[in-house]
Amino acid sequence: MVRRSGVTLLVVALLVVTLMSSVSAQLNFSPGWGKRAAGASGSNGGVGEAVSGLHPSVGGAPGGVVPPGSSSPGDSCGPIPVSAVMHIYRLIRSEAVRLVQCQDEEYLG
């Protein structure tokens, strides 16, 4: 009985290794996709307005964070308002606190 389960385990392991070696995936990220989508149509559910609301100072007004330059044309975002960066930071921090609280409740409960 032990020998049979060992053989079964070996066959399953070989099957998994074979399947994993034949699978491949590629993930591509283009930082300009959002700008193209926002400018593509006028009636896009407010996406264009939301994007333009995040970048009120394209000309380089004070109070913005300027991202590093890009080597490909059309990827120049302009300055990013500090308030937008701080809002994202607060969201991430609050979610991290919530996750820690959930983990504490799980271990203590």
Curated annotation (Swiss-Prot):
Residues 34-78 are annotated as: Disordered. Keywords: Amidation, Cleavage on pair of basic residues, Hormone, Pigment, Pyrrolidone carboxylic acid, Secreted, Signal. Residues 49-59, 67-78 have a biased composition (Low complexity). It is found in: Secreted. Residues 1-25 form the signal peptide. One of its GO terms (molecular function) is pigment binding. It holds the Pfam family Adipokin_hormo. PROSITE patterns: AKH (PS00256). One of its GO terms (cellular component) is extracellular region. Coiled coil: none annotated. The modification Tryptophan amide is found at W33. The keyword Glycoprotein does not apply. The modification Pyrrolidone carboxylic acid is found at Q26. This hormone adapts the animal to light backgrounds by stimulating concentration of the pigment of its red body-chromatophores. Belongs to the AKH/HRTH/RPCH family. This is Red pigment-concentrating prohormone. It comes from Callinectes sapidus.
